[in-house]
């Protein structure tokens, strides 16, 4: 499969010559060292040092993870001299899990450039044949390709098809004829090419790039090749594929075949071919022998040195609250708001006067205040625009013609500062996308919202492999917020628990923050604290359901204009207490109601 190197070189060279800003790659472990060295330009000495265990102070050591899971970034120079930035995402061993993460990274980079429909950051995803056909996250990621909230202008998919998945033959790993048939669901063109013909691979790569540029849609290259050795260093492949490996053992390498072709055409001599090989081998030997002379690591993969957040003053002025509230009733001329919704929007301006700011308005004040201060806000999830429980209404639909009105966009000059996205019905890829997005935009509040917290386990791979562990494994920081509706309120076992205990078990080494605010003002302060925290880390926020409309669960305007997040809210009405109960969320209001009932 080594022909993937000239294939990638051709794609990225084309991107550089077309003046694309950046090319971002997501790939598994197979061939990664080759890509790191020969495409991404990571120095051979640096790779040897990492395998020998020599690290500079503060350099990411990977927390025991394999060295080739680390990413890198740099500048790619084409043969013509044209250049483009290059980014290779860090990834776990879970095959294909990095795909939606990479798409989120690309979308964030495009949003930062903020040139509409330019798509000048290009994603490339590498796959194995068995995993491309077998892993459902591929279907989810392909489905994102033309959705407005996720579009990245077309991805070039390269399937390194070695015709085996560890020990599993194609007849056991897929029903379809080709491993790439999954791409038919989006009508993506698929180019099948012989991996033993590097020039054909380069030609196909250039065609795929032109297709992506012309149509801004996904395109797939199926590079048919083979795995010369086992799945890993200690594997014996002939146990399970004896006939295949009898053929492979007798087969000359791709390099040998191509060198013979060049010699046969008279492009190089036999002596020149041998000399090239010997010189490169000698160069590697010299670098390896000097491996203790540590080369500087890319600063992107150093453990970020950041101070912990202070108890920041997260309050805002009453004028800012009023300005945000005014957006909720500034209905565009000729816009027809649903008659049941209009009173709810009008009530939001009254709430700030009578001290009954509910959760929906508390959210609105939170997002509006961050927008005013220059922080982009991106909220994505199933039914996120209205809110699962019809409390948010961040985007209002004209009941006559279906036009959209996003009230909070009135606070910013650039509408790309505020995205509220109704996601596809996915957890895995949808959460992965937002995680990737958050790693690139530290200034933004990025929220993935579960329809119910119970459903977040559909994205457990993202939670385990990225959200909770990326900092320790790769030095990668994210400030994603997982908003998970939680509470047993009569809707059955699949609509009751966000499984708080699981996230608490995942907490270690200050890897993430877990919160369950009890009032709208507490939500406001903790989100503003989170976005101002220089020690960026993910947050898991257990959001309410019945509290969204509970009259007791409201806040006064003073709770937003003074103070900060309260770690403990005391009860000033009680003296000489004989028992103290620590609680949060709906439990507090249940206890409060019961106490009031007993006092009657």
How should each PLM-predicted stretch be described?
Residues 489-492, 549-550, 588-591:
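Short, charged/polar "capping" segments at the starts of alpha-helices
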Residues 165-176, 184-220, 224-230, 238:
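Conserved phosphate-handling catalytic cores of large alpha/beta enzymes
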Residues 1-137, 142-175, 186, 190-191, ...:
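Conserved internal helical-beta-strand scaffold that buttresses enzyme catalytic cores
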């Amino acid at each position: 499969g080594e022909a993937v190197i000239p294939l990638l070189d051709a794609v990225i060279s084309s991107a550089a010559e077309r003046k694309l800003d950046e090319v971002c790659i997501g790939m598994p472990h197979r061939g990664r060292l080759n890509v790191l060295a020969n495409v991404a330009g990571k120095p051979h000495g640096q790779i040897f040092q990492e395998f020998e265990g020599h690290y500079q102070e503060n350099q990411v050591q990977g927390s025991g993870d394999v060295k080739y899971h680390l990413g890198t970034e740099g500048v790619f120079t084409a043969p013509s001299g044209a250049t483009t930035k290059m980014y290779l995402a860090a990834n776990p061993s879970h095959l294909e899990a990095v795909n939606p993460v990479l798409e989120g990274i690309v979308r964030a980079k495009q949003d930062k450039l903020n040139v509409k429909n330019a798509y000048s950051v290009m994603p490339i995803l590498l796959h194995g044949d068995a995993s491309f056909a077998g892993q459902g996250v591929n279907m989810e990621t392909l489905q994102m390709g033309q959705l407005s909230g996720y579009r990245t202008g077309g991805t070039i998919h390269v399937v390194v098809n070695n015709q085996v998945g560890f020990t599993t033959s194609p007849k056991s790993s897929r029903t379809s004829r080709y491993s790439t048939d999954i791409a038919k669901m989006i009508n993506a063109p698929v180019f099948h090419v012989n991996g033993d013909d590097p020039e054909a691979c380069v030609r196909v790569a250039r065609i795929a790039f032109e297709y992506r540029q012309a149509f801004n849609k996904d395109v797939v290259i199926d590079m048919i090749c083979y795995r010369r050795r086992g799945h890993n260093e200690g594997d014996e492949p002939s146990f399970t594929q004896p006939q295949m490996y009898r053929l492979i053992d007798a087969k000359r390498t791709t390099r040998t075949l191509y060198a013979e072709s060049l010699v046969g055409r008279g492009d190089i001599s036999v002596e020149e071919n041998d000399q090239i090989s010997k010189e490169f081998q000698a160069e590697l030997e010299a670098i390896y022998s000097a491996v203790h002379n540590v080369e500087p690591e890319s600063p992107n993969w150093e453990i970020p040195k950041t101070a912990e957040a202070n108890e920041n003053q997260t309050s805002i002025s009453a004028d800012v609250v009023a300005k945000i509230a005014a957006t909720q009733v500034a209905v565009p001329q000729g816009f027809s708001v649903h008659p049941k919704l209009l009173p709810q929007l009008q009530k939001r301006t009254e709430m700030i006067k009578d001290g009954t700011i509910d959760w929906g308005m508390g959210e609105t004040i939170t997002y509006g205040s961050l927008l005013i201060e220059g922080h982009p806000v991106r909220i994505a999830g199933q039914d996120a625009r209205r809110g699962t429980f019809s409390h948010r209404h961040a985007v209002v639909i004209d009941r006559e013609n279906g036009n959209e009105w996003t009230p909070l966009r009135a606070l910013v000059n650039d509408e790309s500062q505020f995205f509220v996205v109704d996601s596809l019905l996915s957890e895995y890829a949808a959460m992965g996308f937002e995680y990737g997005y958050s790693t690139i935009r530290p200034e933004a509040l990025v929220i993935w919202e579960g329809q119910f917290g119970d459903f977040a386990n559909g994205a457990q791979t993202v939670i385990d492999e990225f959200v909770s562990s990326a900092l320790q494994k790769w030095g990668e920081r994210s400030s994603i917020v997982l908003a998970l509706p939680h509470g047993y309120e009569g809707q059955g076992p699949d609509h009751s628990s966000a499984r708080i205990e699981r996230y608490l078990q995942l907490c270690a080494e200050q890897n993430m923050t877990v919160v369950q605010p009890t009032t709208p003002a507490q939500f406001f302060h903790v989100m503003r604290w989170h976005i101002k925290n220089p020690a960026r880390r993910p947050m898991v926020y257990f959001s309410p359901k019945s509290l969204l409309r509970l009259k007791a669960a409201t806040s006064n305007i003073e709770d937003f204009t003074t103070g900060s997040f309260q770690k403990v809210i005391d009860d000033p009405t009680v003296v000489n207490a004989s028992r103290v109960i620590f609680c949060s969320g709906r439990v507090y209001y249940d206890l409060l109601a019961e106490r009031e009932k007993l006092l009657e």
